[in-house]
Amino acid sequence: ATTFLVLESGQPVEERLSRTYIEGNSALHNVRIQYDGNSGLMAGADFTRYHSPGFQTFVDQSHETTVTDMQNNSKQDISQGALFINHSHTFETGWALNYGVHGGFTSSKTYIDYLYNKGNGYEPALDELENNRQKEYSGNAFLEVSKDFGSHFSATASLKVEYFKSDYTSNGMKSTLWNDWTLFPNATLSYTVNPMHIIQLDISSDKTYPSYWDVTPQESPINSYSVILGNPSLKPYRSYSGQLIYILKQKYTILAFCDYVPDYFAQLPYQNTSELKNVFRYENMDYQLQFGVGVIVPFRVGEFWNSQVTLSGQRMQEKLDHFHDLSFHNEKYTGQFKMDNTFTLSKSRPNLKLDLNGYFVTGAVQGIYDLGHLYDVSSALKWQFADDRATLILKCNNIFRSNMPHTMEINQSGQYSRLWKLDDQRCVTVSFVWKFGGYKKKQHEAVDASRFGKSM
């Protein structure tokens, strides 16, 4: 529940109370068939099914009067299939060749209705009903070559070409969201001066697509003066990254990096020009640019303490010239400290280890937002017994409930707001693992569900 007091010159105080109740669940099923041949041939098929129903109740009151009493039902059904074939071959000259093709199809169905109680029970608002379907067709082919030139220099280069088309049907109206070709160059160069000094250059490119829910023209109220909207005009963004890495004594790492992301998108707020309401919506920016340096230092203290420290500093820049009658070009220098520790409390009978990890970030920018600092401390106590076949793990994440920005502030073109979020993501878990004989867990490619479900 949230309470707001709106003060206007010459007018009495108005108190608004809003209550939101949200429930939902999701189910994901995946089937993958893959053939790995001795000649370097790999072929297979993959199918994923996702289902997620949801329900929301929103009540907004002013004194004793109900302004809005709304119920919202939603449902998302996604079917995704893919076929792929890859082949790798190593020649006697030392050259290695890897190539393949991949084709995919996705169908995402989204249903949303809104029911309002105006004194005679909940009645559907037929003009707000959303019954949408998004169909995606994708195909790509890639070629990768690599070679070791003696004992000092090695190189890997690849190029992928992708075709992607997305058709959208909203309440019977058809449109095309995206229809384009994209090239993805990647390269890795490594030079070993000697085993104590190694230099590596990595260049990569990628593409990120918005979730199916975020391009749906839906509306989800947060409170009396805030709402989340979908953005059917949202575009995918490309990312280009470069890293120069120096490894000293096969132990210490120093790196410099740069990331350029045109059309980068993030959820940003803006003020509605027709009513007193803050609108949160995913928006494409002109670009995001980050560059900086970092260092990774591992160390040990006897057999008791094994640790790794990571320090990095970077400059962040995000720009958008046309943002709902505003524009922004925000820059910020930020730093990060991260430390991972493993303490061996006892090596045998009992075999006890304590993991204690933490990080601190000085702040960041996200579009029009200026984000405050955040930090996180998590730990895990592991007890191995029964000849190390059994493991009991007690884990606590986000111990101090601090892994969200301390403040989210906007001070732009006469618009000022400050948002505090309640961090309630602390989690304590207990798990038990038993290893049967010489069983080794097989490695499986994780299902990419990054575009499934709702993002709040």
Label every PLM stretch briefly.
Residues A1, Y21-S170, T192-I198, Y252-A256, ...:
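Face-selective signature of the C-terminal outer-membrane beta-barrel domain
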Residues A1-S18, P53-E64, K109-K118, D167-K174, ...:
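Outer-membrane beta-barrel translocator domains and adjoining extracellular loop/strand segments
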Residues S26-N30, A82, S138-N140, D180-T188, ...:
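Transmembrane beta-barrel architecture of outer membranes
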Residues Q80-A82, E128-E130, K235, S241, ...:
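Outer membrane beta-barrel strand-and-loop segments of large Gram-negative receptors
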Residues N330-M456:
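Conserved C-terminal beta-signal and adjacent last beta-strands/turns
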